[in-house]
Amino acid sequence: MTGGTERVAAAVDLLKQGKAEKLLISGVNEKVDWILLAETIDELPEELGDKITLGHVACNTRENALESKAWLDRNGFQSLRLVTASYHMPRSLSEFKDVMPDAVIIPHPVFPQTVKHNEWWKWPGTFALITSEYMKFLVVVLSHVLPFSTTSFNIETAGSK
């Protein structure tokens, strides 16, 4: 999932190491293309271009999961590595497991350098980030047990190049 060059770089590294056959970068701004992506990643081999899909449909974590499921189904995969920031992983995992309960989801957390992991409560920015993410996580958990849907998502275009 997008949200920082560290996440994308980690995902590309997994692809380079052969730990994934293909890569979907979900939630990419519509202005971002392969050329701009290559400029932001150090040592991005051109031959990886055919293995990377830029998903321009998703606008939130739930939609990232839906876009990823559509891409997984289209490619015939039953498992994925979920690469996102460590603080975002619990909510992401919850959404992904809800959308694709039969898929094997391997979490691969990234630890952004800008987020203070030790004594995070002493850093106002990190405190706000962690508490906000926790509140969103609680909302997601509740949404999975309550009988309503808040997503209007075009599954037809999800996860396509």
Name what the model sees in each region.
Residues 123-153:
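A transmembrane-helix-recognition feature enriched in membrane-embedded lipid enzymes
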